[in-house]
């Protein structure tokens, strides 16, 4: 098994995050700085036979897999930065160890999935899987029906052409949009390219998972049914 995949299974983060840790030379394998190509040895019971450390602390195989939903408020940073007082890391429970699946901009709010399941994170994050995310957006002024049609058809900005998506009006200055892309600040840049400024952006759903009555700033474990539906949707 490749090192990055094993680290993800241990709940360190997604495979992408595991690769960043390896590139930053923060992972050691049997006392030596680890490389991406390093294999991990497992016994017949799938127990690791190697000594792996992150910043000098031993990495053990993952605790029980956990799945939480968080209603992020504006001002909370999704990056796990101990030195940043606005980081979500200061809001997470001590156990189980959780990390965000993807990100919401610091100036956006709404649904954020937290887990220690690296395989699930990989399938939700990788663009080839194209899972839907639903947002409610309020602009700085009322917009036309043509704006909604343009958003749904795809918008070109900075040599980027966004894919067609679903969009519908909610009010004179608010709309709902369902994306399967995950470009950086995509909705804000699409709106800006059409002459509008986003005043409020809230993620309200990730596939079938919704916020429901969860208060802003609160988090809770997913129900067994929610976990089952989520796993079925990503085929794990």
Which functions belong to the PLM regions below?
Residues 1-236:
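Basic, flexible Lys/Arg- and Gly-enriched helix-loop patches that mediate nucleic-acid binding at interfaces
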